[in-house]
Design a protein with these regions (language model features):
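Acidic, metal/ion-coordinating pockets
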Residues: 1-251
């Protein structure tokens, strides 16, 4: 987490003065899907580091929330712990209303979501359209289920931040042109950065690389020095958000 903090500082320090940074920390940032506890001696430092990093949007799988609570972390009231039904939040930043739809958990990691769960997500996304300028999904379903969902519902979301089993990729307008689909690797292998130009595109307009967005995966590898304020907390493995934590909007 110390290396991740360094990368986030670099992103923040490199932004134009009129840009807004929104950090999103998603499910499976601390545990692999299916795990219930962190390696011995790491949960406490991870909880302390998370408290210092203080992401704008914090979304946790239920087992992660339980693990962090056992480690003494009081989750902020704004934290979202995924459940059996979609949850929503509107987060205003820099004059833009960010509408988040947090997908429900499946029966077990990697399992195909039930049709009822898929329909509930679509309904939540449609209801969010009238409340937000940008509708963002946060999913723990894994890459296969997410791709199938986007293909079947190409207009549901402007951005989908995916997590769980599967590959990592910077935000790309695939498999549908009007949704940016981003996936970071679990447990710290990458951090996703997404820069969105303002004004935000209309829902029926496609995403065009270099025109209305830019995206990349940042790698907190051994070449990145750890932030000393985080490193001093103890033996916490470097973890990166899945979905991406660094989202910027620039005019």
């Amino acid at each position: 987490m110390a290396r991740r903090a360094t990368l986030l500082h670099r992103v923040r320090d490199g932004l134009p003065s009129d840009a807004t940074l929104v950090q999103v920390a998603g499910p499976y940032e601390f545990l692999e899907p299916g795990d219930v506890q962190a390696p011995a001696g790491t949960a406490g430092p991870m909880a302390a580091a998370l408290a210092r990093l203080a992401p704008d949007v914090l979304c946790l799988a239920p087992e992660e929330a339980a693990m962090l609570s056992r480690s003494g972390l009081d989750l902020p009231q704004s934290a979202v712990v995924l459940s059996g039904a979609p949850q929503t939040r509107v987060v205003p930043r820099g004059g833009v209303r960010l509408g988040f739809v947090f997908f429900p958990m499946t029966g077990k990691p990697g399992a195909e979501p039930e049709s009822k769960a898929r329909a509930a997500v679509v309904t939540a996304a449609r209801e969010m359209r009238g409340k937000a300028d940008l509708v963002i999904g946060v999913s723990p379903w894994g890459s296969m289920a997410e791709e199938a969902f986007l293909t079947a519902n190409p207009d549901a979301f402007d951005v989908l931040l995916g997590a769980g089993h599967g590959f990592g990729t910077p935000a790309m307008p695939q498999p549908v042109p009007r949704t940016l689909w981003a996936r970071s690797h679990t447990k710290g292998k990458t951090i996703g950065r997404l820069d969105i130009s303002l004004p935000v595109k209309k829902p029926d307009a496609p995403w065009l690389v270099g025109e209305n967005h830019r995206a990349e995966l940042l790698n907190p590898d051994y070449t990145v020095p750890g932030d000393p304020d985080i490193a001093i907390l103890g033996d916490a493995p470097t973890v990166a958000a899945a979905p991406p934590p660094a989202t910027t909007a620039t005019p």
